[in-house]
């Protein structure tokens, strides 16, 4: 302790009467460690709870003490990084750190003006420098090389301690350069961070000024998760913006807990040499290269209106931000709506300016816009796979080019589809687009990079689509892909060329109509759906033949949203988008009303005379069939794929009979079904009709025909209280062999031989019908492959109910639930004989539940009744 400090401490009463002078001297000479810093508020001399002890005798004479060793503080880490050399202050910390106000063990310093007796008793050489100063920064007024200050100790008395000049030092870590990064503060020998709560540009500007990195600072945030284990020192920093050091700002000492948003304070600094350019930032983007353009003017952030906003303006913004690559303008608050004022409007840059300030524009604050028109930019770095449209009138149209290995190249149009166009336009920021003629744009002279591109429509980037290897193609530049993209209109109205596809049809020319809107495939409701609407869909897909509309989920129910309802086409429109008069997503429909189309439709109803001779002698012939498709466990069949499938319908007073049972056509005039189908409504022929050539129960079709019943013959051994002899024959109305007209969709099945055992002679068995699908009764004809089982399975399961006049069929495993249920009673169990003829071996009769594990279905064995069938039908 120096003499001056000892005198001051004595005058202030810091040395109690009970402590001998020699002990104080010895403590000072041996540099006894100071007390721990007090935990409460600090006041000069004493804490408020203590009384100053009465002085009973004058202080003893003060000997001369050796001065503390001169120790220069270490250089600031940030100064070394930035290339600065700290200038020593003549009587304190270096010039860059004159604001330290705590001791090296963390005790807050007292204000110099609060210890006036020091001046009066033993003024040091530099005391005049501190006269009237109410600050508490560490100084060395007695000429010692190491700054110090007074502090209140744990007992409420005044003591002194050395200071660490690095306390409160600032550095930026983790940035791309020295002008940006996470703010770190040095305290108590450890670097720590600042919680980002209330962190703003005023705080950031003080940091930048303190680091001599310019007077402009932009507040940023960094996740704590990427900083490792590091303490937090401050929160709620509240700078005015003109402070010379962050230590001069109001702030809260971190007391623990959770920092809001778990973000640390960070800054980006910039100089203001040359012309005064406005501060710009990009907000709301997925990276630092894109976002809503915001300007800092008159002390607040604001946006730019997108009137006249184009790629030339974006070029200037990217240049001003130091971002290279492809500059693109974005409109209509693409990166979200901002807040605060709209700063600028009608910006009209040429693209060569250094700052938006140099571009023609409105006066600051003058505009006629809302935040729905906030402008944005993207400054996409030139990396492999970046795409652009070149040679057009703007960035929305032109020749498709891809950047690869430092060079732009084109894409060949082999196999190009609307889905490819959609992915390209979406990546470029547009909602829709269409392929344009390459003749509209100048031919490229660069390489052809890609060929045979195929997108599904779900890709977010063009390079996610399947394609050939880079540079492999068999094209010329006359086959370059050209595209015109369109933004989404107001209220989500569609522009031209949104993707359309047909699903679940028998071929690519038919199916359920689905459209791709707002990133999702969805369906169209069939309200008002006509052949004119179908014609537009088919034309959009490139088909020129006749088109037919299909309603009532003819091709099965879709999934996802129902995008469109009440389509009104005249038949001459270029695309479905021209027919849509109602807002997207607005409807009153279910997927049971999904619309469909058949393109290049050339179906024609067959003539009875023309088919009589060629088809009357043929049975079991499937003219229309395709790959196997698996009622319960089944899927839609092919139209006309099971031409002997008919339905027994119960007539009603309205004339539209409902499905009662399935049945099998044996000839033009005879149908085979189950006897139990007549158990409830009796055997009066007036109650029933038979429909042949049907596929969708609610949609009339060209091969469909409904015929009255002339005779019902139930096997004489059938009893309503039994399941045995469950077989019946139905005679259709009409002349002999001229009841039903044969066609590719209406043909008879073959009968088996008497006592034929299908397990040995047949394979590839199916059940068909409109029955239970596991969710509801189907509107479209279903089919399901089903294995024949040894009779012992049903004998064990059903005991005495199963007889030798029955067949056992079905899957025993729960995960392969295939069965023929209530709506398919009387329907056929068909198996294929070698030679491709199909034989009706079973009639759906009964079972336990529907698709229940270990409960196979039971079918009437037709081969046991062949003599009876022939005697009745005379076949």
UniProtKB/Swiss-Prot annotation:
Q: What is this protein called?
A: Neurotrypsin
Domain (Peptidase S1) spans 631-874
Which BP terms does GO give this entry? exocytosis; proteolysis
Query: Which PROSITE patterns is this protein grouped with?
Result: KRINGLE_1, KRINGLE_2, SRCR_1, SRCR_2, TRYPSIN_DOM, TRYPSIN_HIS, TRYPSIN_SER
Gene name, Swiss-Prot/TrEMBL:
PRSS12
Q: Name one GO cellular component term.
A: plasma membrane
The record places domain Kringle at 93-165
Looking up PANTHER family in the UniProt record yields: DELETED IN MALIGNANT BRAIN TUMORS 1 PROTEIN-RELATED, SRCR DOMAIN-CONTAINING PROTEIN
Check the record and name the InterPro entries matching this protein: Kringle (IPR000001), Kringle-like (IPR013806), Kringle_CS (IPR018056), Kringle_sf (IPR038178), Peptidase_S1_PA (IPR009003), Peptidase_S1_PA_chymotrypsin (IPR043504), Peptidase_S1A (IPR001314), SRCR (IPR001190)
**Which residues does the UniProt record annotate as the domain SRCR?**
170-271, 280-381, 387-487, 500-601
